[in-house]
Amino acid sequence: MSHEPKSPSLGMISTATRTTATVSPLTPSPLNGSIVPNVSPASQSAHSGFAAALRKLAKQAEEPRGSSISSESSPVSSPATNHSSPVSTPKRGPMGPVIVPPGGHSVPSTPPVVTIAPTKTVNGLWRSESRSVREVESVPHGVSRDRLSSEAASAQEKGGPTVPAHLIGNPYPFGLTPASVMQDSRFQPLNLPRQMPHAVPTASVPEEYLRGFRPYATAEELRMPSLPLGLDPATAAAAAAYYHPGYLPHPSFSHYRMDDPFCLSALRSPFYQLPAGGALPPLHPSAVHMHLPGVRYPGDLSHPSLSSLQSERLSERLQMEDELRQREREREREREKEREREAEREKEREREREREKELEREREREREREREKEREREREMERQKERAAREKAAESHYLTELHGLRGAPDDRAKPDRITSNRPEKTKESILTTPKPIQPGIHQSLNSTHHPVPSLSSAHGLYLGPGGAGPTSLTVATMLQRTEEERWLARQRKLRQEKEDRQYQVSEFRQQVLEQHLDLGRQGEIPDMNVEGHRPVPNHHEPSSRDRDRDRDSHPLLGAPPPLISPKHQHKDHAPPPPTTLWNPAALIETSTDSRRTLHDPPSLGHYDISRLPLPPSKHERHYNSEKLEEGSRKRDSLDKYPPIRPSGFSEPNTFLAELEKSTQSFLNQQRAPLSLSGPYGELSAGFKSSGPLKNLQGHSRLAPDTTLVYDEFLQQHRRAVSKLDLEERRRREAREKGYYYELDDSYDESDEEEVRAHLRRVSEQPPLKLDDSTEKVEFLEMFDLTTLAHREEMMEVKRKKRRRMLRERSPSPPTVQNKRPTPTPLLTRFTPEDMNNSPELEDKKRFLTIFSLNHITQQQRRDNERVEELLQAIKQKSVTLDTIRHNPHPLCRSPAAHSSDQSSQSPVQSEELLNGWPLSPSPSVSIPQPSADPLSISDQHRPLSDPPKPKDSSLPPALPDKCRANDSLPGKSSSLLNSLRQPPFAKESSVSVNGKTKPWENFIAEEFAQQFHESVLQSTQKALQKSKGGALVVLEQNHAVDSSVHYNIPELQSTPGRSKPHPHPPSSQPNGQHCPPQPSRQELSAEESEEEEEEDDTEEDEPSTSRWQGIEAIFEAYQEYAEEQSIERQVLHSQCRRLEAHHYNLSLTAEQLSHSMGELMAQKQKLAAERENLQAELEHFKKCLTLPQSPWSRAHFKGYPPR
């Protein structure tokens, strides 16, 4: 049996089962497969040794007819065994039918035997060997076995049916004693068959069954009878199926068989010879039971048919076969498990390899990304260089070309080209654009604005956002293309095989795009005759195309054209305001050509669109012919829409910068990934800034269609493309181009990374310039969003409000303020006198100065109060500044006794008090408070106070003194004081402007009061008449001078620095000292205080001056704070407890769930185990019951009579 060589393996042995049938058909061995034992290999007990022997035999043997049959059946059994031999064996199909395999009894066990028998050896060597072996083993059985074996051999050679060995009556299948080698080998084979059931296809099993039964048909088939003997009830049933009532003689015919075993074989042969096709298998299961409905083994059947044989022997054999089968089953199970384990290991290894590959791919992607970034950086640098060069060139050409622009159609074409470049290197192209602009770009820009064609060409020029036209198309296209490229690159990594094809595809796409561009753009570009510009574009173009490619490699995720389509320009259809990036679309000529171009790109499909800009040079070429007419048209359009660019050109730098910016922002939008964003932003800015642009806009009126064109044009860009759409488009393209596009590839992790990178890029981009297209704004408003500019305005308003509110005590404080007005006086055993006499007074004063507070004596407080009253009176107009000036003392006379220090301080405070309210800026104004310490905040506003000082600042030292005091006072009050005091003192000594002339101590309270009043008058006058600046300067000087005089309060010393010129000192008279007009006190304070604050909260704020509320206020505030804290703590504690309880409940639930999970898992495992058992049983039953597809016996095919 040619297949035999494979048989050698144990699996083969089991396969051999079929073979056995062939060999031993004569002998009962077919069942047992003892035939093999006859062969020395068989005696090796079906081990690898045996298998090897079988193999040798197979090689040596010629293939007898029977053997071939057996080999065919053998495949069946061998499948069970999973040996190579079984595979070949199937050719012996006829033998295959041996039923034994299902039972796993003799045939399966026989495999070793079978193997040998099928082996060609069977005919020659096998026969002789088997004979000898048989003789040895058959000794007990005697001649009958010998004869059987010889017959079997001859039968095999002849292929004629032989009497089954079991018919002959050998107690053991092959006449071998149970201990005989045959049996050993058979045992293993049996085990193999056991495994066979799992591994072997049912067909193979049936073959073995058939083979077992077929002993009649062929020598090999003769073994079949043994099968029935060894069958389990299940197996028996299967066997019975083979003995279809029609085919098998009914038990009633057993006598007949008994009488003539050969007759039996003859009777059965036709049935066994059923075509391998499985004539038998179709038999209804009922057929199986026909003979052995409940019989455990075909014993019943065999008894009747073999009544001549000793039934004891049959039963013995059956028993033995059962045992063998049992053992085989176990062994097979073990082998099955082993195989499963092996498969598991293999799978694990596979997974490991997969993981390795994945990591490798990841690393590759990482490297790719790095390279990409590197390339991007290089491109960026190149672009910058080019931009610089272009800008220079543009500047020189700008003005000259502005006028020539219209005339130069060629230039226009060039811009187109530039545009194309731009897509490729957005930044670069933009830069490039400026250059072309120099000669023709201006005109092209203009034309761009007007005719769509120019737009396309201008696109390059057209600085990003503005250019919704081809440029944006280009950009979008480019982005998409970049995306595509990147995708392709990824594919390349994942599938090197596809690399070339995909590259070609992308190339092809680019070519197609270019063609599209050429065709579609010809109309447009003609407007911009490329000639003039071409040189620049050309020199950029190659790189631009490359750049395009690069970009493709990292598309902007195929970002659709920027949402902020330049449409906002379109808003009014009026030429876009200079601020907006000019929207080429808006200027688009309505000419059919231009429109066609616009539409064409969209038709191109996103890739095409993205690429459209690429071919400018080609476009230009095409355009040349059309350029002339286009040029004229453009000129018209220029007239219609004066070149926006020209206006921009007038300020070439700005315009370019702005253009660049806008383009950049536009591009950024489109392709956040591109680093170009910066320049484009500039461009757009340029657009906005360029006044000339405005002029252009004014001229340019969009043609009625423009809107349409513009809209459609924009629509292409604006249309958001969903990822799914992109995916679909790519897939379609892949289908058309003939490469395989896998969804998985498109969505690997790198996609997520790209998206993340894209988002990062988008978020890092400078704010977009075109942020106010009505469409966009309306859309955003739906989500309570607004444009950045509008947001800034709103924020400004809010800030003003907030500032006002803060100035006016914020709403929440109001309650506190309400309380504060009536603070319960703090009880203290210290009187102000005690406090003033305390040894640490100096330290305390220093401490107070830290908080801009002044220590005031009782006298000072009184003075302050007086001043406050005076100011109040002035405010209420009961007293006028004039009266004060003429009569200062009466109003507030400070006792001369007061040291100038005191006087100065008190004025300060009083001034603070007076102005205090208005001064609101500093919360604490020194207002005399009942506070235990005669401390009041006088300094807080001091900085403010400085400004009010009269310009003249010719205050005598006293005045500076006062100023200083004022310093300590809230700024306003101090300014008032200064102005009040200044007049007299100024007169006294303008020289003493630097209060240095006199030490403060020299001043008398009265003088101080006078000075104070005068300074107040002056400051008011100043405030009214004088520009804040002068007064401030003077004040500062005064303060600086004064600083020489040292109050205890260090703050005074720093006054100059502190003094914060009132930005709006009350309009002070040029000469602050003479204040003829007496602005109402209110005005003064209001002006001073509020002017300081940018906000215009003048008079209203005055009342809400921050004043020193006294220590009580502090305590009160602290108390409130403590209360709030405790409330907050309570809330948090309760919340915390609630959460803890919740958490506890959740953890309990989690525990329960984990328990139930564990139980479920256990049950699942149990079920799985049960299922496995059931499955195993099922398999077993299947093996037993499936009818083998019985190949016709060789004899049948070769025309041997059935016998």
From Swiss-Prot:
Q: Which residues form a coiled coil?
A: 314-398, 856-885, 1150-1186
UniProt keywords, alphabetically:
Coiled coil
List the biased-composition ranges (Low complexity): 66-79, 894-910, 918-930
Name of the protein in question: Genetic suppressor element 1
Q: Where is the composition biased (Polar residues)?
A: 12-47, 441-457, 971-981
Feature: compositional bias, Basic and acidic residues? 137-149, 313-428, 530-554, 622-639, 939-952
Q: Outline the segment boundaries, as ranges, of region: Disordered.
A: 1-97, 137-166, 299-477, 514-654, 796-840, 881-994, 1050-1108
**Keyword field contains Coiled coil:** yes
Superkingdom of the source? Eukaryota
Species source reads: Danio rerio
PANTHER family referenced in this protein's UniProt entry, alphabetically: GENETIC SUPPRESSOR ELEMENT 1 (PTHR17608:SF4)
Q: Where is the composition biased (Acidic residues)?
A: 1085-1103
